[in-house]
């Protein structure tokens, strides 16, 4: 796996699924391929994106700044600085300075990542802030190691939280989670179907599923009534793709 592929993988792992994630993935690909060369426009676009947490925006802004060539005097962006200040905690800043001194001695991406993984997310963010604000300099490779370590920690905590929700025995939470997943799957089906004649059936299935979820929420139903709803939708989507000549493994 190339360095930039690895960076893209880690960064995208902390972005919530949805149309915005696909858009960000495209921007990252363009930036890494040297296609998107106006940092000012890119940062303005990032600043106005909805849904993303300030820290995720800060990390993406840091990655864009590392990758896109820019004039030396280009102003640093406040939304990135605020996200990478470690919540203003002086302890985070102290640890960030210690980490920075260690990173100065590293020359490889993996070496930097290993060193960074032993620090808290707050300290890692503060260290990125130091580098972003030009208070310290490291090689791009080392900076990317710091980025990936931060993303790994965030993704770990998100995964723990997700696992807790999936394994919860509370039937109401499981019921709502199944309905949310069915609804987002239906939305994805509608987007993928496009406007071809064969798409009418897939659109109809997706529309019915969304109406069903809407009705279930409106009248309130037994928590077990949503079981299998998303799986049925995915089976329909696979059947549609087969008819369209697209062979895909089921994505569960």
Swiss-Prot record:
Gene3D superfamilies associated with the record: 1.10.10.180, 1.20.91.10
One GO CC term, this protein: membrane
Membrane topology: Peripheral membrane protein
Classification via InterPro entries: Flu_matrix_M1, Flu_matrix_M1_C, Flu_matrix_M1_N, Flu_matrix_M1_N_sub1, Flu_matrix_M1_N_sub2, INFV_M1
Region: RNP-binding, residue numbers: 165-252
GO MF: RNA binding; structural constituent of virion
Keywords: Host nucleus, Membrane, RNA-binding, Viral matrix protein, Virion
Pfam families per record: Flu_M1, Flu_M1_C
Domain of life per record: Viruses
Sequence motif: Nuclear localization signal, positions: 101-105
Subcellular location per the Swiss-Prot or TrEMBL entry: Virion membrane; Host nucleus
Function noted in UniProt: Plays critical roles in virus replication, from virus entry and uncoating to assembly and budding of the virus particle. M1 binding to ribonucleocapsids (RNPs) in nucleus seems to inhibit viral transcription. Interaction of viral NEP with M1-RNP is thought to promote nuclear export of the complex, which is targeted to the virion assembly site at the apical plasma membrane in polarized epithelial cells. Interactions with NA and HA may bring M1, a non-raft-associated protein, into lipid rafts. Forms a continuous shell on the inner side of the lipid bilayer in virion, where it binds the RNP. Determines the virion's shape: spherical or filamentous. Clinical isolates of influenza are characterized by the presence of significant proportion of filamentous virions, whereas after multiple passage on eggs or cell culture, virions have only spherical morphology. Filamentous virions are thought to be important to infect neighboring cells, and spherical virions more suited to spread through aerosol between hosts organisms.
Subunit annotation: Homodimer and homomultimer. Interacts with NEP. Binds ribonucleocapsid by both interacting with genomic RNA and NP protein. May interact with HA and NA. Cannot bind NP without genomic RNA.
Other information: Most abundant protein in virion. When expressed alone can form virus-like particles in transfected cells.
Protein family: Belongs to the influenza viruses Matrix protein M1 family.
Protein name: Matrix protein 1
Encoding gene, per UniProt annotation: M
């Amino acid at each position: 796996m190339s360095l930039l592929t690895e960076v893209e993988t880690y960064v995208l792992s902390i972005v919530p699924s949805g149309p915005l994630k696909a858009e960000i993935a495209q921007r990252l690909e363009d930036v890494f391929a040297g296609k998107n060369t106006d940092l000012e426009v890119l940062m303005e676009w990032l600043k106005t994106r909805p849904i993303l947490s300030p820290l995720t925006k800060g990390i993406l802004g840091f990655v864009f700044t590392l990758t896109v060539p820019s004039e030396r005097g280009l102003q640093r962006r406040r939304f990135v600085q605020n996200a990478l200040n470690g919540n203003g905690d002086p302890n985070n800043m102290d640890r960030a300075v210690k980490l920075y001194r260690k990173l100065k001695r590293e020359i490889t991406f993996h070496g930097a990542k290993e060193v960074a993984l032993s620090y808290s997310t707050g300290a890692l963010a503060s260290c990125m802030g130091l580098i972003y604000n030009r208070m310290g300099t490291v090689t791009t490779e080392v900076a990317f190691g710091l980025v990936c370590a931060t993303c790994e920690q965030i993704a770990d905590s998100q995964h723990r939280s997700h696992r807790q929700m999936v394994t919860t025995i509370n039937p109401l939470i499981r019921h709502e989670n199944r309905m949310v997943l069915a609804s987002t799957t239906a939305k994805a089906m509608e987007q993928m179907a496009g406007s071809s004649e064969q798409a009418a059936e897939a659109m109809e299935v997706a529309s019915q599923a969304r109406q069903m979820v809407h009705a279930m929420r409106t009248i309130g139903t037994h928590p077990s009534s949503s079981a299998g709803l998303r799986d049925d939708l995915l089976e329909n989507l696979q059947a549609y793709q087969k008819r369209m000549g697209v062979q895909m493994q089921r994505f569960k």
